[in-house]
Swiss-Prot record:
Forms a cylinder of 14 subunits composed of two heptameric rings stacked back-to-back. Interacts with the co-chaperonin GroES. ATP binds at residues 30-33, 51, 87-91, 415, 479-481, 495. This is Chaperonin GroEL. NCBIfam families: GroEL, PRK00013.1, PRK12849.1, PRK12850.1, PRK12851.1. Together with its co-chaperonin GroES, plays an essential role in assisting protein folding. The GroEL-GroES system forms a nano-cage that allows encapsulation of the non-native substrate proteins and provides a physical environment optimized to promote and accelerate protein folding. Belongs to the chaperonin (HSP60) family. InterPro entries: Chaperonin_Cpn60_CS, Cpn60/GroEL, Cpn60/GroEL/TCP-1, GroEL-like_apical_dom_sf, GROEL-like_equatorial_sf, TCP-1-like_intermed_sf. The lineage of its organism: Bacteria, Pseudomonadati, Pseudomonadota, Betaproteobacteria, Burkholderiales. The gene is groEL. It is an enzyme of class 5 (isomerase). It is found in: Cytoplasm.
Length: 546
C-alpha cells in the first residue's frame, strides 16, 4: 500500500481552498450575458471553446493533490446541479466558493464548524421557502423562449426554437438535439408514435419516391413471438382481406414461408401488408408492444395470456389513421386507442419514472411517455465549423434543460435578484447559538455573490450595483446585457426556480462539508527510478546520413 500524507486543520483547509478558488475562478468568468468563453485543450483535434460552467469544471484536474480535493468537491457541486436541474452550474460554483471563503474566516476565528453548518442549513431552508413563494408558473410560449434564451447565453434564436418545439410536442414531449447539415438551426417534428424498426422486406414499399410503405386506415396485428408458419396467420389474413384494408404486422420476427407469402400477396395486390420487428428487447419489448396496443386500441396476442395467433379476430387488432414504414423506423399516426386508456398508461409510466434509479431507465420511460402523448421533436443545430457546432450544441442542451425545469417549478427573476431578495427571509432568522448566527450571516453575504460576479463580468462596480438593487423591491434588478436597472421579469430575464434552488442547496451542502473537515489524506507520489539508458548503436555505421 502506498504511503499517505496527512494534513490537519488550517494547513489542510488552506490548501483545499486554493483548489476551490482555481476551479471557481475559471468557471465564474462565464457567468452572465457578458461572461467570457473558456478554451479547453483537447488531446486530439481542435480545442473546444465553451461558456458552459460544468464543461469547464469537468476539465480541471490539479497537480497538487490537496488543491485537487477542493477542485473535485466544487466540480461535484457543478455536476450534481447539472444532473438535477440541467443548468445553474456556474451559479452553484460561485455560491460554493463564497460559502467556503466566508466560512473559513469564521473557522479561523475559532467558531465551531458544526454549528456554522447548522446555521448555514437553516438559512438555506429559509431561502428556498422564499424562492418558492416568489416563483411564478410558466404558461406562455414567450416565457419559455425567454428562459431558453437566458440559459443559452442570451441567444434568442435558441430560446425561440425550443419554445416552438414545446408548442409542437407538448411540454412532456421528447426533444432531442442533433448535429445539423446547414448553417441555420432547424426543427423537425415526428408526429405520432415512432419506433426504430423498419420493413422486413423492401418489396413492401409502395411509395418508391419516399422509399416507404404507406398504409392508410390499416389494421395492426401485434404478436410477441416469431411467425414462420403461414397457416397460423391465414385466419386473420382472410378476415382482413374481406375488409379491403391494409395490415401492419408487428412481431418478434416474420420469416421463411410466412414472409414470402406476405410479399407475394402484396406484389399481386391481393392484400396490402407490411411486417416489422417489434421494438426493444426483453421486458422493454413487452412494455412497448403493450404501449402500441393501447395507442391503436388493439391487444397484444400472447400465449402467456392464453391467446393464439390462429384464433385472432379483427376485434383484437389495433387501428390507426395512417402508418408509414421506412427502412429503419415505423411511424403510427393517429392511433384509434381510447383516450382514457392512453391517459391511464401515461400515468402508470410516470409512476415508474418516479421510482427509476438509473438515468438510462428514466430516459427510456420518458421517451415512452412522449410517444404515447404525441410526438418527438428534433432540433438540428447549424454551425460553420465543428468547434462552433460543439459549443452551440452544448448551449442548446443547457437551454432545453432550463426550460424543462421552468415548466416543472416555475420561474423567478434572473440576474441573481431572486437570491438577493431571499436575504429578507434569512435576515429574520435566529440561531440557537452565536456560532449558528454566524452561519446564517455567512449565507446573507454568499447570496450576493452571483449578482456581484455577473456585474464584474460586465465591467461594472459590483458593490454599487448590489446596493442599488437592494434598495429596490420585487423584480427590480440590473440587466447586465443592456446595463440598465429595470423590472427583470418584464424584460424577460428569468431563471427557473428549480435551477436557482438546486444551485443554492448543492453549493451549501458541499461547502459546509468542506468547512467541517479537520484533516485531509492524500497518496504520496512514488519516486520511480529513471529508465535505463538505451544501448549504443551498431559499430561501423558511421558516415550514414539519416
Amino acid at each position: 500500500m502506498a504511503a499517505k500524507q496527512v494534513l490537519f486543520a488550517d494547513d489542510a483547509r488552506v490548501r483545499i481552498v486554493r483548489g476551490v478558488n482555481v476551479l471557481a475562478n475559471a468557471v465564474k468568468t462565464t457567468l452572465g450575458p457578458k461572461g467570457r468563453n473558456v478554451v479547453l485543450e483537447r488531446s486530439f483535434g481542435a480545442p473546444t471553446v465553451t461558456k458552459d460552467g460544468v464543461s469547464v469544471a469537468k476539465e480541471i484536474e490539479l497537480k497538487d493533490k490537496f488543491e485537487n480535493i477542493g477542485a473535485q468537491l466544487v466540480k461535484d457541486v457543478a455536476s450534481k446541479t447539472s444532473d438535477n436541474a440541467g443548468d445553474g452550474t456556474t451559479t452553484a460554483t460561485v455560491l460554493a466558493q463564497a460559502i467556503v471563503q466566508e466560512g473559513l474566516k469564521y473557522v479561523a476565528a475559532g467558531f465551531n464548524p458544526i454549528d456554522l453548518k447548522r446555521g448555514i442549513d437553516k438559512a438555506v431552508a429559509a431561502a428556498v421557502v422564499e424562492l418558492k413563494k416568489a416563483s411564478k408558473p410558466v404558461t406562455t410560449s414567450k416565457e419559455i423562449a425567454q428562459v431558453g434564451s437566458i440559459s443559452a447565453n442570451s441567444d434568442s434564436s435558441i430560446g425561440q426554437i425550443i419554445a416552438d418545439a414545446m408548442d409542437k410536442v407538448g411540454k412532456e414531449g421528447v426533444i432531442t438535439v442533433e448535429d445539423g447539415k446547414s448553417l441555420e438551426n432547424e426543427l423537425d417534428v415526428v408526429e405520432g408514435m415512432q419506433f426504430d424498426r423498419g420493413y422486413l422486406s423492401p418489396y413492401f414499399i409502395n411509395n418508391p419516391e419516399k422509399q416507404v410503405a404507406a398504409l392508410d386506415d390499416p389494421f395492426v396485428l401485434i404478436y410477441d413471438k416469431k411467425i414462420s408458419n403461414i397457416r397460423d396467420l391465414l385466419p386473420v389474413l382472410e378476415q382482413v382481406a374481406k375488409s379491403s384494408r391494409p395490415l401492419l404486422i408487428i412481431a418478434e420476427d416474420v420469416e421463411g414461408e410466412a414472409l414470402a407469402t406476405l410479399v407475394v400477396n402484396n406484389i399481386r395486390g391481393i392484400l396490402k401488408t407490411t411486417a416489422v420487428k417489434a421494438p426493444g428487447f426483453g421486458d422493454r419489448r413487452k412494455a412497448m408492444l403493450e404501449d402500441i396496443a393501447i395507442l391503436t386500441g388493439g391487444t397484444v396476442i400472447s400465449e402467456e395470456t392464453g391467446m393464439s395467433l390462429e384464433k385472432a379476430t379483427l376485434q383484437e387488432l389495433g387501428q390507426a389513421k395512417r402508418i408509414e414504414v421506412a427502412k429503419e423506423n415505423t411511424t403510427i399516426i393517429d392511433g384509434a386507442g381510447d383516450g382514457k386508456s392512453i391517459e391511464a398508461r401515461v400515468k402508470q409510466i410516470r409512476a415508474q419514472i418516479e421510482e427509476a434509479t438509473s438515468d438510462y431507465d428514466r430516459e427510456k420511460l420518458q421517451e415512452r411517455v412522449a410517444k404515447l402523448a404525441g410526438g418527438v421533436a428534433v432540433i438540428r443545430v447549424g454551425a460553420a465549423t465543428e468547434v462552433e457546432m460543439k459549443e452551440k450544441k452544448a448551449r442548446v442542451e443547457d437551454a432545453l434543460h432550463a426550460t424543462r425545469a421552468a415548466v416543472e417549478e416555475g420561474v423567478v427573476a434572473g440576474g441573481g435578484v431572486a437570491l438577493l431578495r431571499a436575504k429578507q427571509a434569512i435576515a429574520g432568522l435566529q440561531g440557537d447559538t452565536p456560532d449558528q448566527n454566524a452561519g446564517i450571516k455567512l449565507i446573507l453575504r454568499a447570496v450576493e455573490e452571483p449578482l456581484r460576479t455577473i456585474v464584474t463580468n460586465a465591467g461594472e462596480e459590483a458593490s454599487v450595483v448590489v446596493n442599488n438593487v437592494l434598495n429596490g423591491k420585487g423584480n427590480y434588478g440590473y440587466n447586465a446585457a443592456t446595463g440598465e436597472y429595470t423590472d427583470l421579469v418584464e424584460q424577460g430575464v428569468l431563471d427557473p426556480t428549480k435551477v436557482t434552488r438546486t444551485a443554492l442547496q448543492n453549493a451549501a451542502s458541499v461547502a459546509s462539508l468542506l468547512l467541517t473537515a479537520e484533516a485531509a489524506v492524500v497518496e504520496l507520489a512514488e519516486d520511480k527510478p529513471a529508465a535505463p539508458a538505451m544501448p549504443g548503436g551498431m559499430g561501423g555505421m558511421g558516415g550514414m546520413d539519416f
